[in-house]
Amino acid sequence: MNRFSFPLLAALLLLIAVPAWAQTDVLGQARAAMSNGDYSRAATLLSGLIGAQPSADAYVYLGISYAHMREWQRAEDTLKEGATRYPEDPRFHNELAGVYLAANDLDRARQSLKQALTVDPANRYAGDLLATVDMSMGNVEGALEAWNRDGRPVIGDVLHNGHVEFENWTIAKASTFRTGEILTWGKWKTTEVRLRETAIYANTGLEIEPTPAPDRYTAVIRAPLKTNSTEQLILPALEALFFRSPTLRLWNLRNSAVSLRLNYRFATNRHRAEVGILAPLPLPGLLFLEATGTYRSERWDISRPAIDTGVDHRFRFQSTGVRAKVKHIPNYRLELGAGFEYRNRTASGSQPGIALDSRNTGKLLFDASVLVYDRRLRSRIQGETLIARKNLLGDMDYSSGTIEWNNRYTLDDEGKHSIEVTAKAGTSRGALPIDDYFVLGVRERGNNLLRGHNTVSPEGHYGNSPMATSFTLVNATYDRQIRRLPFFNVLNFPYVDLKWLVFADGARTFDRAHVFEEGKILVDVGGGFKLETPTRTFNLTYGRSLRDGAGTLAAYVGRRW
């Protein structure tokens, strides 16, 4: 057997080691040049090395050198080539994110950081930078999801508008996170929903700031309190113009979190006065108490939706009532409510079947809402029911309930295009009084939208749209944002989104009492404009009924969800 001689073996090892030594030496020279700020020399050395003996380190350092030389395109091309040749190395995606951030391209930076986390889920640098980028874009959910990958952010201090002392006691009671706990999206969202339900804050937001302590962060709740300045009188003036129903709102009386609402509708044939109080109760998680007292004096004319039996379809309705209701929000996905309402009624007319008499009603009220899905698609199921009984201070026995399924899908990342579809159904038992019939159509604060039918006649009478003891209803709306108008909390909201919309509504009604027409499929189509704040909407639409060809131009307000 032939054996290698020792000199031959040494020569062979030397030949193998020379290229590696040479590569290491060139990399060392390039790193030294980079340390001295001589990125041009480093780029020259690394370019030659890649041509002769490419490596992941050479590509990474060359991309960094080009970035420091502000040659962004060459840096991007180099790092992308390196990522293609060495797909298991997350450094290329980390550095690409830095290149995109330098160009203020936040979307592509986020994409690169997500790719880095796909390659290495334990990449703390990419996770932290992704969370920081998301926070700067206002994407709190994305930021918290990125941090939560490795058990962050652990909360050190909780501030309100940058202050250690909370400006109102509801902050502490609504909050679901404490010092030393990991903040998750669910905890913040529950806190945010509770704060908005108090109705005393113009807006709510969250900022996460690092602290000198490792892995500790400060949570800053941004929630400016609403004011009762004279500028707020603009809204009642607009309500008087559009609805003849101005509402004076006094927020957070003496910083107690109690708010007062005074409303008077002076519309001909539809007078109404209401006093309402909203008071969060100082319990863990908050319990919301809303109490209202209402007076109504109205003239109705139901000749359009009623079956023509030859009787006079006009009548007068009056009532004085009180309502108290409590709501609890254990989680942002779940809301529960219960209450009681008493009405002292007086009604007079010749129309049979709708309790035109002086019998009073006492009712138990229950409602629940479940947010089933909360991503680009938001899906919610909610139900309401009332139970009227003679042993509840009333003179009538009946019940009714509704269930609805709300869906909204955002078509783009910016949230400027969306489609909303709602399916709703209601039913009842017992002889319903006219004031608890289901009414479909458009009114100031309508719950059952059929936007080609106005609930009010040109003469100002209620009873102009379909009414029923049970119904099914579908609403479909597409809207697109035209512009976001900043208001800087001048009118107690930070901004208003101006949108245009088109819609199609379909419904079918039924009436056990055989007072109103039933069974026909109703279809309304139309369009209009919408103003949206973070919590409310104002809509101005024109809808046309395909069943009878009638059209209506109407304004109404709603609540965002």
Task: Report the location of each language-model feature.
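C-terminal outer-membrane beta-barrel translocator/porin domains of Gram-negative envelope proteins
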Residues: T230, K363-W500, F510, A555
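Register position in tetratricopeptide repeats
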Residues: S35-N36, H68-M69, A102-A103, S136
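Gram-negative/organellar outer-membrane beta-barrel architecture
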Residues: E197-Q382, R443-A468, T537-N539, R544-W561
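Alpha-solenoid helical repeat scaffolds
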Residues: L27-G28, D57-Y61, R91-E95, Y125-L129
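Periplasmic polypeptide-binding modules associated with outer-membrane biogenesis and secretion
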Residues: Y86, R91, G98, A102-L241, ...
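Alpha-helical segment of the N-proximal tetratricopeptide repeat
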Residues: T24-S55, Y61-I64, H68
